[in-house]
Amino acid sequence: MNKQKLTYLTIGVIVFYICLLVAWHLYDPTAHFTELQPGADHRPAGHVRKADDVLIGEFFMQDSSHPSTLNSKPSALKGEWPCFRNIHRDNQTTLTPAMKWVEGDMKEMWSVETGEGHAAPVISEGRVYVLDYDEQLNSDALRCFDLQTGKQLWRRWYRVPMKRNHGFSRTIPAVSQGLVVTIGPEGHVMCCDKTTGEMRWSIDMKKRFGTEIPFWYTGQCPLIQGDELVLAPAGKDTLMVGIDLQTGSTLWGTPNTVGFKMSHSSVMPMILGGVQTYVYIGVGGVCGVSAEGGNRGQLLWNANAWQPSVVAPSPLQISSNQIFLVAGYGAGGALLQVDRQGATWTASIRDSYKASEGMSSEQQTPINYQGSLITILPKDGGGMRERLAMYRPDDLHHPVWTSAADERFGLGPYLVIDDRLFAFKEDGELYVYQLHPSSMILLHKQRVMEEGVDAWGPMAYADGMLLLRDSKTIKCLKIATNN
C-alpha cells in the first residue's frame, strides 16, 4: 500500500514539472513590452559614427579663468618660433637688439605636465601651442598656453585610441595667417583659429590618401608656404599634396609613381637648380617636387639608392646642389647631388657610409651654421657616439670638433640663437656653447629636469624664453632679458 502511494506521488511530481517546463517555454515575457521609438527618451541627438571614425576637433574647452581669451587683444610679445625648425627651417634665430643674455643659471618661469610623448611646442605672439595626447581621454589635444605664465587658455581635442609606443605624441604644429595646423600621431590634420581655437577644417590622411602610418606613428610636421599647406601623405596614389590653408581644399597633388611610403621625416623647402623645391625622404627613397607656379606638384627627380627602413631626420641642404641625408638604426649618412640641365634633372648618391664612419644622426635634423654642420652622433657612432660634433660640408668623415667625452646627449635636441648653441641632454640637462667657425666653447650647463626622461622633443625660443620638454613635462626658462 505504501509502495503504491509512493508510485502515485512520483508520477504526480513528474507530471507537475513537465507542465511547468511546458508553461515556461510557452510564456512570452516581452508580450507586454512597448517598443521605444527614436527620441522618446528625450536625449539630445548624438553623432552617428562607425567604429573607426575619428571626429577631428570634436571637443573644445576654454579656460574659465581666462574669459577674454576668445576676443583678446594682440599680445605685447611679438617673438615667433611658429613651426618645426623655425620659419626658415634652419633651427636658428637671433636675439632682438633690445635683449641681453642671462648669465649663470636661467630662471624657470613655469612648468606644465603633458601626456607621454615628444611633441614639441611652437610660439606665436605670446602664445604657445602643442599637440598633446591626453591618456585619460584617449585623445589628441591641441593646447594653447600663455607664454609668460604657462596658463592654459584653451584646448581642442578629439578621441583617437592608441597604444603606447615610446609615448604617444610626436609632431610640431605650424602657425601662419592667424591659423594653427597640426598633424596627429595617426595622420589626422586639424586647422584651427590660433586665437579662439575655432575649428576650420580637417583631413584624415589614412582615409583620404590611403596613408600607411609608420610603426612609431606620424613624425611629419606640417609645412606652410604662403597660402598653402604642404603634406607628404605618401599614400596609395598621392605622394605629396598642396592644401589651401584657409579652406582645406586640395590645390595640387603629386602622383605616387615612385611608390614611397610615409616616414617620420618632414618636407623641407629648398632652392635647387634655381627652382623652389619641396624635398622629402620617404620609405623608399628621396624626391624633389616643384613648388613653383603652374608646375607645382610636378615630380622633378627621385633617388632610391639610399633608402633606410626608418627615417626621422629631415633632409638638410648643404650647398646649391647637395643635400645631406641621415637616418638611424645603422643607416648612417649619405650625400645626394641634384643637377639640372634644362628640363632634365638627375639625382645621385655621391657618398654613403655607416654611422661610425662619418657625420650621422638618429633623430634630430643637423644644423647648417655659417657653413659648418652640427649634429649629435647616434648610439652606433663608434667612440664619439652621442657627442656633439662639427663637420665641414666638403668632409663628412672627419669632424673638426667634438664635445668632451662626458658631454654626451643621447637623442636630445639642439638649436642656435645668435652665436650660441643650446643642447639638451635626453636626461634633462641643458648645455650652452659659444660657437666659433671650427669649434665650440662650453659656457654654462644647468640641470633643468631633476629626473628627466627621453627629452627628445625639439626646443623653441621667442621673447627671451626657451621652451624645453622631456617625455611628460614642458618647462620655460628665461634665457634673455631686456637691456
Give the positions of each predicted feature.
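Structural motif
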Residues: 137-141, 237-241, 285-290, 330-337, ...
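Loop/turn-rich, solvent-exposed surfaces of beta-rich toroidal or solenoidal domains
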Residues: 331, 357-437
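Residue position within the beta-strands of beta-propeller blades
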Residues: 128-130, 182, 231, 280, ...
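Extracytoplasmic beta-rich repeat domains
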Residues: 109-122, 137-138, 155-174, 202-224, ...
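Blade-level signature of beta-propeller repeat domains, shared across WD40, Kelch, NHL, RCC1
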Residues: 428-429, 452-483
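Aromatic (tryptophan-biased) beta-strands that constitute blades/sheets of beta-rich domains
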Residues: 4-10, 22-114, 140-162, 198-211, ...
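Short coil/turn segments that connect the beta-strands within blades of beta-propeller domains
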Residues: 125-126, 177-178, 226-227, 274-276, ...
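Short loop/turn segments immediately following the C-termini of beta-strands
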Residues: 86-89, 133-135, 185, 234-235, ...
